[in-house]
C-alpha cells in the first residue's frame, strides 16, 4: 500500500497537494501544526478540509515552542502584517525562522510511524516570497539528513516547487477542485478565508495567479502539464 503524509495548513498550496495526493496514493495522512500562529482559524480550516477531502488521518501537533523562539508578524500581534510591495527585497517579516525545518522533521517522525514512503509539502521556489526554507536545495538537504538520521528512505515530494501561482490554480482545476480551493482554503496573512483581505502579499500572489490562469487557461494548463508530467 502506498502511503503519504501531507504537511497541511489548509491554505491553497497544501490543499492542492492533498487533492493530488489522494489521487496518487492509497492512503494519505495530514499533519497540521499549532505553533501559536496569529490566525488560528487556519487550524480549523485544515481540520474541515482534511475531513471533507477524505484524508485517512489528521494529526494536529502542538509546537507552540516555535512561537517563543521565532519572532515574525505571523506569530506576534505586535508586528503588523505588511501590505504587498512588488519591489520589496530581502526576507519579509512574515518569515517564521525554522518553521519548515521543524515541520518537515516532525512530519518525518510521523511518517516513520505510519510507514509512509513520502512526505508532501507545498513549498514553491518560483513564488517563494523570499523564504529561504522554501528553496529546492533546502528541501533536498533536509531530506538527505532525515534519511541518514532515520536509516530509512522517506521521500520529500514538492509537487509545486517549479509551478508559478497560475499553474498551481491550473493543477487544482485539473483535479476539478478549483472552486473548493478558491472558496474554502485560508491563505491570507490576515486570517480571512477564501479570497482573503486582498492587501497582503499572500492574497496578492493568489489573486494575480488566479486572474492570470482564468485569462489564459489553455496556455497555463499546458505549461502546468509539461512541468508535472500530467496528461
Swiss-Prot record:
Organism phylogeny: Bacteria, Pseudomonadati, Pseudomonadota, Gammaproteobacteria, Enterobacterales
Protein's recorded name: 7-cyano-7-deazaguanine synthase
Pathway(s) of this molecule: Purine metabolism; 7-cyano-7-deazaguanine biosynthesis
Residues annotated as binding Zn(2+): 188, 197, 200, 203
A biological process term (GO) from this entry: queuosine biosynthetic process
The enzyme's E.C. designation: 6.3.4.20
UniProt gene name: queC
Keywords carried by this UniProt record: ATP-binding, Ligase, Metal-binding, Nucleotide-binding, Queuosine biosynthesis, Zinc
Needed co-factor(s): Zn(2+)
Reactions catalysed, as given in the entry: 7-carboxy-7-deazaguanine + NH4(+) + ATP = 7-cyano-7-deazaguanine + ADP + phosphate + H2O + H(+)
HAMAP family assigned: QueC (MF_01633)
Cofactor note: Binds 1 zinc ion per subunit.
